[in-house]
């Protein structure tokens, strides 16, 4: 879903990053080759749809033209695809779009994967927070693709750094967790999470659960595991 690296789109990121964008791409490449190979060993077939994010762009200025070809995310995806193709590993298939979205189907359930920064909406206020913009953006995306003759059951995205599941959309959590940016904007605290769901051949998405991506400090329970009123 993009933003595989923090990037250099802000001066403070350049100052705080450990290494350069190229360093990060090379490190990610090694990590993901192992991860994808391990998944293929366990599941035999692996399909990887991709989308690039806003943090991975090569320029600080936001680009629309040739945006994919100016993205470190997109470069990383292509490096991985070429690696497995050169090793003739037919268990693994990528779908790498040149545009902002990737459309695919699993059985009869249609998905649109996008990073989330190009929903055509802005902001979020009050207690609703980001839910309002996400819901409006999902509706805009669905309407746009309906004009192309494509129906969408689920829009999948990241970008918002919080795990959210609403009707017709799944927003992935963030691996990096809470940071200075989130605190300065008073965003709700959330531990690192990733979205996991199953797609049933007949019923579509039937099971969803957030995967906690942080090993917390073990706590000794102070009370019994179950309590009820006397």
Task: Name each model-derived stretch.
Residues 69-100, 106-213:
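Conserved beta-sheet core of the metallophosphoesterase superfamily
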Residues 45-54, 92-102:
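Acidic carboxylate-rich catalytic motifs and surrounding loops in phosphoryl-/glycosyl-chemistry enzymes
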Residues 1-80:
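Core catalytic region of metal-dependent phosphoesterases/phosphodiesterases
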């Amino acid at each position: 879903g993009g933003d595989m690296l923090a990037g250099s789109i802000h001066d403070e990121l350049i100052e705080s990053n450990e290494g350069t964008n190229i360093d990060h791409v090379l490190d990610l490449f090694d990590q993901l080759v192992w991860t994808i190979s391990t998944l293929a060993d366990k599941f035999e077939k692996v399909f990887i749809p991709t989308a690039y994010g806003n943090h991975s762009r090569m320029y600080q200025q936001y680009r629309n033209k040739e945006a994919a070809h100016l993205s470190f995310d997109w470069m990383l995806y292509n490096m991985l695809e070429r690696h497995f193709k050169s090793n003739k590993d037919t268990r693994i298939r990528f779908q790498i779009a040149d545009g902002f979205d990737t459309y695919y189907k699993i059985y009869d359930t249609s998905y649109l994967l996008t990073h989330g920064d190009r929903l055509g909406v802005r902001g979020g206020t009050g207690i609703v927070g980001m839910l309002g913009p996400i819901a409006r953006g999902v509706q805009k995306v669905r309407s746009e693709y309906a004009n192309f003759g494509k129906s969408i059951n689920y829009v999948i995205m990241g970008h918002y750094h919080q795990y959210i599941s609403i009707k017709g959309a799944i927003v992935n959590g963030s691996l990096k967790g809470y940071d200075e940016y989130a605190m300065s904007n008073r965003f709700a605290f959330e531990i690192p999470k990733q979205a996991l769901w199953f797609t049933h051949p007949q019923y579509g998405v039937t099971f969803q659960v957030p995967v906690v991506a942080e090993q917390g400090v073990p706590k000794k329970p102070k009370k019994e595991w179950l309590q009820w009123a006397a």
